[in-house]
């Protein structure tokens, strides 16, 4: 499930690569899922954080083969930068909690 900031060209390329891989390997589609996909407790769980998504990208054999390791590493590093920048920010919760403890 892509975010609103996804690159539509990369997203489409990834979907096409996955579809072609499925056709080539004659993979069966899993049964349709209903309910909250983020609460799915199967092995095919949707990443809940950018770090989880980055890890899934880096460990995807299919995407590394389709895009090449260099491309995957580039986008993984971009995600890591985003994570590092986010971790530098003091959130409203942290500020509020700090005042509560003071």
What role is predicted for each listed range?
Residues 1-102:
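Catalytic-core signal marking the mid-to-C-terminal active-site face
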């Amino acid at each position: 499930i892509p975010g609103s900031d996804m690159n539509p060209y990369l997203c489409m390329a990834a979907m096409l690569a996955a579809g072609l891989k499925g056709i080539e390997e004659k993979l069966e589609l899993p049964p349709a899922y209903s309910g909250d996909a983020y609460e799915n407790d199967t092995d095919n769980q949707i990443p809940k954080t950018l770090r989880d998504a980055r890890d899934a990208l880096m460990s995807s054999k299919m995407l590394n083969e389709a895009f090449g390791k260099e491309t995957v590493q580039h986008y993984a590093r971009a995600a890591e930068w985003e994570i590092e920048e986010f971790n530098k920010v003091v959130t409203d919760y942290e500020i509020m909690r700090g005042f509560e403890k003071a």
